[in-house]
């Protein structure tokens, strides 16, 4: 049976083969088309897979963005709460500051008012001080004028002081000269004391000669020559020598011309000393002469004694030749003794 079936099928083989070939070709074509479609589908699938991958990535990024946005939103919410809290604290601080500033403004206003009163008071004080300054300026001007006057006076006083210094030097020099004069006068006084004994004896002889002259005049008889010394010049020689020594010493020790103030003071002292001298006049000498007793120091006493002795010794022996002695000059000072001696000589 089996062989019969195959025998029947053999003539059908080429047709089957052709049909199969055609079928195969069609199948191949279909397969090719299917492969093409498959390749296109695969391509599309790859594209879609890539797109899906991108979409997945985008979704993940979106998810991440959402999470980050959520975190950001939470952070923003937290920041908003914090800012609200900070704003509340800032408002409270601002309110406190406003209160403090208002209090400070009130204090500043009070201080401004106080300063205004102080400024007004100080402006008054400044006005008073300006008035005082004006008065002080006037006083300074007057004081400057007085200072100028005092400066001129001080210049004059300085000039006077210079003159006084020069006068002091002159006075010192004159004091040295006076000490030298005192020494010389002491020497002359010693010499006069030595010659006093001789003068007393000579005075006795002179008295005797005067008595003899008077008796000879009244009796018209010549005086006895035996009582008189043989040479009258020998009697008068020692006092003349002493009197000549005194003016020589005075001329040698005569000081230089002094300043006018010192000369005036010496004249005043001399007038005071001579005013103190009491004048002794006898009853018999009222019309003729009057002796003056000098109450001076040791220098003036020695000079006065020498002058009186020279005057008595130089008198003429005759009573008719007696000279009338006038009063001494009260203004004569120590410097005027040489003039007196010249008159006596």
From Swiss-Prot:
Residues 223-345 are annotated as: Disordered. Residues 261-277 have a biased composition (Basic and acidic residues). One of its GO terms (cellular component) is extracellular region. The gene is Luzp2. InterPro entries: Luzp2. Keywords: Coiled coil, Glycoprotein, Secreted, Signal. Residues 16-211 form a coiled coil. Residues 298-313 have a biased composition (Polar residues). This is Leucine zipper protein 2. Expression found only in the brain and spinal cord. Glycans are attached at residues 133, 301. Residues 1-19 form the signal peptide. Residues 164-192 are annotated as: Leucine-zipper. It is found in: Secreted. The lineage of its organism: Eukaryota, Metazoa, Chordata, Craniata, Vertebrata.
């Amino acid at each position: 049976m089996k062989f019969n079936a195959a025998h029947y099928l053999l003539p059908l083989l080429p047709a089957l083969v052709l049909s199969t070939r055609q079928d195969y070709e069609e199948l191949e074509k279909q397969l090719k088309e299917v492969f093409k479609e498959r390749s296109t589908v695969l391509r599309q699938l790859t594209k879609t897979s890539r797109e899906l991958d991108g979409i997945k990535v985008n979704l993940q990024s979106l998810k991440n963005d959402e999470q980050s946005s959520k975190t950001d939103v939470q952070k923003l919410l937290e920041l908003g709460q914090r800012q609200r809290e900070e704003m509340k604290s800032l408002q409270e601080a601002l309110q406190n500051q406003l209160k403090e500033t208002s209090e400070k403004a009130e204090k500043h206003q009070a201080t401004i008012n106080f300063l205004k009163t102080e400024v007004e008071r100080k402006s008054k004080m400044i006005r008073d001080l300006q008035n005082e300054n004006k008065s002080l300026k006037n006083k300074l001007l007057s004081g400057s004028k007085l200072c100028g006057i005092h400066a001129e006076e001080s210049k004059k006083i300085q000039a006077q002081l210079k003159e006084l210094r020069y006068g002091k030097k002159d006075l010192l020099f004159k004091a040295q000269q006076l000490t030298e004069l005192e020494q010389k006068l002491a020497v002359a006084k010693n010499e006069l004391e030595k010659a006093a004994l001789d003068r007393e004896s000579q005075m006795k002889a002179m008295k005797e000669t005067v008595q003899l002259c008077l008796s000879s005049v009244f009796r018209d008889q010549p005086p006895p020559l035996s009582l008189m010394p043989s040479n009258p010049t020998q009697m008068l020689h020692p006092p003349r020598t002493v009197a000549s020594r005194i003016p020589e010493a005075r001329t040698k020790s005569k000081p230089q011309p002094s300043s006018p103030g010192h000369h005036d003071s010496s004249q005043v002292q001399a007038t005071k000393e001579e005013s103190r001298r009491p004048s002794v006049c006898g009853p018999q000498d009222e019309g003729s002469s009057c002796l003056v007793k000098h109450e001076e120091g040791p220098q003036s006493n020695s000079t006065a004694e020498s002058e009186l002795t020279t005057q008595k010794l130089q008198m003429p022996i005759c009573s008719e030749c007696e000279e009338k002695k006038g009063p001494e000059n009260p203004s004569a000072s120590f410097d005027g003794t040489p003039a007196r001696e010249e008159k006596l000589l």
